[in-house]
């Protein structure tokens, strides 16, 4: 599909929301985490306004991270992403990694801080 200026646009399938539409295992932890993020999106997000400096937004990032990597890893990734989204933090496109490297183990959650930060530093 093209707009009047000739730019191509992808069309989202009908019925899809703003969150990641890919397939993911519906485990209890993932359902709980993504439901919490969705509840935030439907209630508090409207009061906060468009204040996110990243693309996808922090709540979309957290939803996708929890859906892809589970409540523990995805929750930490979303938490650290929100911390990076301040006035002196990172900005720009910061996608959720499809696969986590072996160094991101469950018993060292502070390592998840590095995921979006390193990519943002290399682009600057």
Curated annotation (Swiss-Prot):
Membrane topology label: Peripheral membrane protein
Swiss-Prot/TrEMBL keywords: Cell inner membrane, Cell membrane, Membrane
Main location: membrane
Low complexity: bias regions: 12-24
Compartment list: Cell inner membrane
Region Disordered: start-end pairs: 1-24
GO CC terms, sorted: plasma membrane
Superkingdom classification of source: Bacteria
InterPro entries documented for this protein: Membr_insert_effic_factor_YidD (IPR002696)
Function: Could be involved in insertion of integral membrane proteins into the membrane.
PANTHER family: MEMBRANE PROTEIN INSERTION EFFICIENCY FACTOR-RELATED
UniProt family annotation: Belongs to the UPF0161 family.
Name under which the protein is recorded: Putative membrane protein insertion efficiency factor
Organism: Mesorhizobium japonicum (strain LMG 29417 / CECT 9101 / MAFF 303099) (Mesorhizobium loti (strain MAFF 303099))
